Amino acid sequence: MENLYELLEEAAHKVPTKGILIVNNSQCDLFLTYSELREKSRKIACILKSYYQVKPVSKIIISVEKSENFILLFWGCVMAGCIPVLMPSVQFSNKNSIAFERLKNAIDILGVVTLITNDINLFEYYKSSFHKAVCVEDIMKQLDLLQDYSLHIPKRDSKDLCVIQFSSGSTGAPKGVMLSFNNILTNLKIKTLADEITTEDTLIHWMPYFHDYGLFGNHLVCLYNQITEIKIEPFSFLRDPLIFLKKISEYQVSICGGTTPSGLDLLIQKLEQSNDIKELDLSQVKTLSIGAEMVPSNLYVRLSPLFQLGFNRNAFRPSYGMAETTLIVSSCLPGYGNKNIRINREAFYEGIIKLVDKQQDFCEFVSAGRILPGLQVRIVKDGIPQNNLNLGEIQVKGACVMSGYYNDIQSTDEVLKDGWLSTGDLGFFDYNNILYIVGRKKETIIVNGQNFHPFDLENCVLEKFGLSIEKTVFTSFYSSTENREIVLHFFVLSRKMSEEQIRQLINECNAFIADKVGFAPEY
């Protein structure tokens, strides 16, 4: 298999009655079979080519809200031989939003593009420029009317550009990650291995399709394995996270597609407040992939309410990856279990990984698992590859690694050298070649010549003050007037407090951090 559209063609022929169940908790669920998805996508490809005059390898930004429309447009672009550019839905009325700014930056980088949007004001704004703007509702109306059509799908090579995904990672301006057909198909293969997916499985997820986890790690994985996908609309999940568990129980789902620690935390909060969950059965779940964010060390403690519903602790699979590697790089594989590691905090801040006994002050990190087949990972410090239990930057090499950033040779050259991708993430291997992620290189806080990692500081605060503080962030900036780093601490309260109580909490937090690491935040 060399071309992405072959996934849909095969699924439509071999399992025509399987498909995507799109769950919206304010409306009736929608089931779209793979046969229907193929037929509608082919029609959209014809509409794009004949009515909107798009040419093969044209770049088409998909910025629409509804999952059904997004996935139809994605496949329509692929079958028209175009290059879909994945972006979140943007509202013109909110021109000060990060999403709108990212869209403008993406268009500047891409040059002449076709923008498909569900926002009529955004459509009017861009149709008057040299770009081509298309309203998704117009395409869907033509889709309903189109009867007779013929489609020639342009032949594409496995190394050709397939998708552009704009991702700024944790820092920096948005960059267009260029992924080939081979990048994506290779990652689908190793994702299938990591999650032990078979043709008997059903997968559920709530991640948006513009995210690599939502599109590659969930939708395309379902097509690759010819299984049914249950897609909960993201806004439906945020409104009622328990719908995720209810659908798992209702359909006896076996695979929970990639989700985030913050999403799971939101789910647990609602679960703890609900009395209407006793009849739920989660015992069929064999895999729940966790990624896209740093995984907190107390995750398994927080998720204990799920175990009372039959959820298997070994189903949790922390993983590691990024847009630049298509999706997944490592995962906690079956049979190896999930493992936390404790290391000496003082040594860690000096860049040394030293295992601790129970009496020592420690940092704790969650395993990101083993490196998956076909990929190489090394830890590098000052340009020198490191041995196990040495901290450094994570570099990745393999068939899933992007070819570069679109129209950005400088940024590409900064991160890609001799096939090795510098991720900007810091981590280390233990003696069993298990990978651990400790933070971002650019986010390291330097105080008095020592390196401190925000994720560890945040974990400390949440473990100590979890009843009062819901979310917390540490960061810093360099003050040229004082010629030193200024440390900032932000947090969100988990309950109402008076001004006096808040001041007392701040003082207690500062004293606690000072005792732990030798300095206190100044703001």
Regions found by a protein language model. Name each.
Residues L7-T33, L161-I164, T171, G321, ...:
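AMP-dependent adenylate-forming
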Residues P16-K18, Q147-F166, G172-A173, N183, ...:
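Conserved pre-ATP/AMP-binding loop-to-beta segment of ANL
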Residues I20-V54, S58-S67, I71, F92-A99, ...:
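Conserved AMP-binding/adenylate-forming core of the ANL superfamily
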Residues N96, F100-K104, G111-S158, Q165, ...:
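ANL superfamily adenylate-forming
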Residues L185-T202, D212-G257, Q269-K270, S274-N275:
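Conserved AMP-binding/adenylation subdomain of ANL enzymes
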Residues V253-G258, K270-D361, Q376, G383:
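Gly/Ser/Thr-rich phosphate-binding loop
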Residues C256, G398, S403-G404, L426-G518:
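AMP-binding/adenylate-forming catalytic core of the ANL superfamily
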Residues F365-L389, E393-P454:
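Conserved ATP-binding/catalytic segment of the ANL
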